[in-house]
Structures are given as C-alpha cells and as structure tokens.
A protein has these predicted regions:
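C-terminal regulatory/interaction module of P-loop NTP-utilizing enzymes
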Residues: 1-215
Length: 215
C-alpha cells in the first residue's frame, strides 16, 4: 500500500483550482494553530499561549481564520527556554526572549504587513498599540504613529484641501534602541493584557506631579 502525505496552504488563493481537484481525490485534515502546545510556557513573564491566542483573535476579526499564526512561530522560543540545563534557567530565558524579539521583527511583523497590504493601523490593532496612547507608554509601542498637517509638510498653498488636511505616517520602533518596545517584556504582555501598563502610567504621572510640586 502506498500512502501519500502532503501539506498545503489553503490560504493561498492562487492554488484554488488545484485545491478543488485535490479535495476530490484525497482526505483533507485541517491543521489549525494549537495554542495549548505553548501552555505554561513563560518567557520573562510573557505567556506565549495567551500571546498567540490574542494575536489570532485579532487577525481573524481583521482578516480571516485561515491566516491565523501557527504555534510553530513560537516553538524555537520554547526550545531555547527549555534548552541546555547547564547554562541555567536565567541564561535560557534570556536566549528565548532574544528569539522572541527576532520572531516578531523578522517573521510576524513582515507577515502582518503582507496580510494587511501595509495598512499599519490594522497592524497596530493586532499588536495592541492603540491602547498605548499616553506619552508615558511610548517606549512600549511597536509601531509609532505621527500625524502632521499638510501645511506643516508642504507649507501653505499646496492645493490638497480637496482630499484631507493632514497625513498620518507610521514607522517601526528602532530595533537597535535597547529601550524600545522590542526589548521590553511588558510590551509583549500588553498585547494580550493592556492592564499591565496601568501601573507604569500611574507611576509616571505620580513622578510628574511630584516634580511639579517641587518647582
């Protein structure tokens, strides 16, 4: 007996005709993301299971379920976390966190860019950056947003009032900046739990009030 086993990305619509032909001849088994494979896996306090679940909930709403992220994105992170016992837990966890940073920078963010055709506002929604509005939380924002009027950009007499009078631009936080969101465990936690930043915001506001009272 000959068993033919293969994998296919049904989200790729260019394969639609082939997909139909294959479905008539083979049994199809859907392989969806399995967040439970990440259960109990924490890296610098970041719950990988909750992170994947929330990312996929948002992608499903903004796009569709076939484009949700597989748990395989985070398996190299888990492997490093549970890796070489001789290096110690702290060293393993740090290596895992660096891998998580690179996974977001080199895999997840570029994939989201492709999904949403560089609609950065939707990417911000997936990452929860829309919940980090105050200046005190700017270092936890992955995609920075800046709005400027056309007068500021072009000067007066630009003749663009027919369309709109301002432009919003986006840019990724600088990965080489050690204080940027990429390197902040709280930034990843805030993706699935925005309340973790409330203490930071409250502390910053208290410091500002204290400085004002000392003047």
């Amino acid at each position: 007996n000959l068993h033919i086993i293969g994998t296919m990305n049904t989200a790729d619509r260019s394969l639609a005709m082939m997909d139909t032909a294959l479905r008539r001849r083979f049994d199809f088994v859907e392989m969806m993301p399995e967040p439970k494979k990440l259960q109990g896996k924490l890296v610098n306090g970041i719950d990988l299971e909750r992170l994947l679940i929330v990312l996929n909930e948002r992608i499903e709403v903004l796009y569709d379920r076939e484009h949700t992220l597989g748990h395989a994105f985070f398996m190299p992170v888990v492997d490093l976390r549970d890796g070489n016992e001789q290096k110690g837990i702290e060293a393993n966890e740090q290596a895992a966190f660096i891998e998580l940073q690179n996974t977001f920078k080199n895999k997840i963010i570029p994939l989201l860019e492709e999904y949403f055709f560089e609609d950065w506002n939707k990417i911000r929604l997936v990452l929860g950056d829309n919940c980090k509005k105050s200046d005190a939380l700017s270092q936890y924002v992955f995609i920075q947003q800046h709005t400027a009027s056309y007068n500021d950009i072009f000067g007066s007499g630009h003749g663009l009032e027919t369309y709109e009078d301002k432009k919003t631009t986006y840019k990724l936080a600088d990965f080489n900046d050690e204080s940027a969101a990429w390197h902040q465990p709280l930034a990843y936690k805030a993706i699935y739990d925005a309340t973790v930043l409330k203490a930071v915001e409250k502390s910053t506001n208290s410091d500002d009030e204290q400085e004002s009272s000392n003047l």
